[in-house]
C-alpha cells in the first residue's frame, strides 16, 4: 500500500509539468505549421521540406517516460555516485584529436563510469546523444569548459540512448548539423552513433568518451533521458544538473568550476559549493 501511495504521489507531481511540456509542444507545432503555410503561400522552396510534428503519441510517451526516469533516479546531491557500466570509446592511434575508433572493429572496452574519476579532482559527466539538439548545440561550450578547466578537473562524455531517433520520435532538422540516427539495436549501433557524433564535433583530448550499455544502466541511475550534467567529487555527487532539455545548463557547471578553482586558494567546505537544480 505504501509503494502504491508513493507511486501515486510521484504521478501527481509529474502531471503538471508533463502537461506544460505538452502545451509547449503544441505551441511549437503551431508556430512551425504557420511558418510552413506562410512559406507555401509565398511559393518558397523552403516549404517543400517535410514537416515533423513534435506532439505525437510517441512524443507524449517519451516525455512521460523522461519524467518517470527523473523521478526514480538513483542519484542524489551529496549521495554516492552510481558506478554504472559503460563502454569506452577509444581514440585513434594517429595522433589526431578528432580521430576515434572502436576496438576490434566493434566496441571499446567495458569499464565503469567511476574508473575515470580521480579522488583529488572533480569529474564533470556530460550525458547526451547526437539526436538531441540542446545537447549538440552546447558541445562547443562544453569543449571550452574542457580546455579551460582540464588543469583542475576531469571530463567525461557519456553517449546514451537517442533522444530523437529517425525511426521513433524524430525531431525536425533545425540546423545543418542535425543528425539522423535510428534506434540502437545493439551495442555496436550505439558505439557507431558515438563515433558519428565525434566525427562531427572535435572534442579536446582531455575529455574521455564512453557509451552507455544497452540496458541503459547509466541513463536510469542518473535519470538522464535526454541530457544531463553532473559533477562527481570523491565518489559523491557534488553538483546535480537539472533535467534536460529545459534545465540543462552548462553555465552553472562553469560557475561551480570557478568556485572550485577558487577553493584551491581559499579552502571552503564542499557543502558551500554543492548545488542542486534537479526537479
UniProtKB/Swiss-Prot annotation:
Principal location class: endoplasmic reticulum
Annotated control of activity: Not inhibited by N(6)-propylthiouracil.
Enzyme class: oxidoreductase
Sequence intervals crossing the membrane: 8-28
Expression (tissue specificity): Highly expressed in liver and in various parts of the brain including telencephalon, hippocampus, cerebellum, and brain stem, and weakly expressed in thyroid, lung, and small intestine. Not detected in skeletal muscle, heart atria or ventricle, gizzard or kidney.
Keyword Plastid: no
EC number(s) from the headed UniProt entry: 1.21.99.4
Localization per Swiss-Prot or TrEMBL: Endoplasmic reticulum membrane
Family per similarity comment: Belongs to the iodothyronine deiodinase family.
Name of the protein: Type II iodothyronine deiodinase
Organism: Gallus gallus
Lineage: Eukaryota, Metazoa, Chordata, Craniata, Vertebrata
Gene: DIO2
Amino acid at each position: 500500500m505504501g509503494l502504491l501511495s508513493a507511486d501515486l504521489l510521484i504521478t501527481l507531481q509529474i502531471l503538471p509539468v508533463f502537461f506544460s511540456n505538452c502545451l509547449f509542444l503544441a505551441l511549437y507545432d503551431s508556430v512551425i505549421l504557420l511558418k510552413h503555410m506562410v512559406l507555401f503561400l509565398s511559393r518558397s522552396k523552403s516549404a517543400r521540406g517535410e514537416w515533423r510534428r513534435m506532439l505525437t503519441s510517441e512524443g507524449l510517451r517519451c516525455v512521460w517516460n523522461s519524467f518517470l526516469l527523473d523521478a526514480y533516479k538513483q542519484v542524489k546531491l551529496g549521495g554516492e555516485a552510481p558506478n554504472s557500466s559503460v563502454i569506452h570509446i577509444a581514440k585513434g592511434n594517429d595522433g589526431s584529436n578528432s580521430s576515434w575508433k572502436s576496438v576490434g572493429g566493434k566496441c571499446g572496452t567495458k569499464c565503469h563510469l567511476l574508473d575515470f574519476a580521480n579522488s583529488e579532482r572533480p569529474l564533470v559527466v556530460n550525458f547526451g546523444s547526437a539526436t538531441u539538439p540542446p545537447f549538440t548545440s552546447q558541445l562547443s561550450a562544453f569543449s571550452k569548459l574542457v580546455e579551460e578547466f582540464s588543469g583542475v578537473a576531469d571530463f567525461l562524455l557519456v553517449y546514451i540512448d537517442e533522444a530523437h531517433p529517425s525511426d521513433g520520435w524524430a525531431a525536425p532538422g533545425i540546423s545543418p548539423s542535425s543528425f539522423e540516427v535510428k534506434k540502437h539495436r545493439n551495442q555496436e549501433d550505439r558505439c557507431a552513433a558515438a563515433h558519428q557524433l565525434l566525427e562531427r564535433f572535435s572534442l579536446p583530448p582531455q575529455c574521455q568518451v564512453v557509451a552507455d550499455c544497452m540496458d541503459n544502466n547509466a541513463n536510469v541511475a542518473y535519470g538522464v533521458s535526454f541530457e544531463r550534467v553532473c559533477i562527481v567529487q570523491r565518489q559523491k555527487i557534488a553538483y546535480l544538473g537539472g533535467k534536460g532539455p529545459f534545465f540543462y545548463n552548462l553555465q552553472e557547471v562553469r560557475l561551480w568550476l570557478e568556485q572550485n578553482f577558487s577553493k584551491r586558494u581559499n579552502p571552503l567546505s564542499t557543502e558551500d559549493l554543492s548545488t542542486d537544480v534537479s526537479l
